[in-house]
From Swiss-Prot:
Gene name linked to the record: tal
Pfam families for the chain: TAL_FSA (PF00923)
Family affiliation: Belongs to the transaldolase family. Type 1 subfamily.
Role, per record: Transaldolase is important for the balance of metabolites in the pentose-phosphate pathway.
Domain of life: Bacteria
Catalytic activity as recorded in UniProt: D-sedoheptulose 7-phosphate + D-glyceraldehyde 3-phosphate = D-erythrose 4-phosphate + beta-D-fructose 6-phosphate
Keyword Cytoplasm recorded: yes
Active-site residues, record numbering mapped to chain: K126 (schiff-base intermediate with substrate)
Taxonomic lineage from the root: Bacteria, Pseudomonadati, Pseudomonadota, Betaproteobacteria, Burkholderiales
Record-listed E.C. numbers: 2.2.1.2
Disulfide partners: none
Quaternary structure (record): Homodimer.
Pathway the protein contributes to: Carbohydrate degradation; pentose phosphate pathway; D-glyceraldehyde 3-phosphate and beta-D-fructose 6-phosphate from D-ribose 5-phosphate and D-xylulose 5-phosphate (non-oxidative stage): step 2/3
Keywords (A to Z) from UniProt: Cytoplasm, Pentose shunt, Schiff base, Transferase
UniProt protein name: Transaldolase
Amino acid sequence: MTTALDQLKQYTTVVADTGDFQQLAQYKPQDATTNPSLILKAVQKDDYKPLLEKTVKAHASKPVGAIIDQLLIAFGTEILKIIPGRVSTEVDARLSFDTEGSIAKGRELIALYKEHGIGRERVLIKLASTWEGIRAAEVLQKEGIHCNMTLLFSLAQAAACAEAGAQLISPFVGRIYDWYKKNAGSAWDEAKDGGANDPGVKSVRRIYAYYKKFGYKTEVMGASFRTPGQILELAGCDLLTISPDLLQKLHESTEKVERKLSPDIAKESDIERVPVDESSFRFLVNDEAMATEKLAEGIRAFAADAIKLEKLIDALR
């Protein structure tokens, strides 16, 4: 029997969401995504301590931020030896409200990859989908530096990213699901509120329809999944980035996978254009409690993990 993972690959580009590159080869993903939390998790494993120690030793005289950049590039370089496509490398979350700082960091990361013989076409620079992050992406994209817009929880963010010409967006499914489930409390009914009615699934479906209806070239990559069911509800999305645990579950399953999203159906959507000027963007994101809370929470969490990584590196110097 064909696995659910192989069936999914007929409709969607499968991406591995991990810093643990030793797990990659068995699932044959096209691309891979990383973030500060995933890199922190990886370097705490014995398998990756030699890479961490080698990187810190080679750049010990540099500021800790520069060593983190070198570590991100080291992981990205190893990942690109395994996958045929692109790796996503994230800009420090503490720059989420700093357009110029984000632009500078994006350029630095691409320059470091170039020093390792890796062209910009194989790298996506991950930026938070704040107003400032989106403006940074607009500049970087015009320079030929492709951007992956992360921490995306609303149609307003997605619309602004598309207008800015971002290469790709990563709308978060699981974190949206978490918020609605937590806020519903005892009223949550998984049978009724999950599956096709899952708030995270519905959010990505809506964004996908918006992009296809209005002809945007920006790629939609569903992210942050909790279950195989959430993934399969989005079969047909441009890309889906999936953790190794869930890739394994899909690999073990022979469940029949049907295409749920397609450009032709999406183009028939009655969805309307969203204003993307700064005041409208800020109001619309603020008006959606889930998006506001999860964006802020996500930035705090990624920033906290960057600080933990700094302390880990300082302890090795």
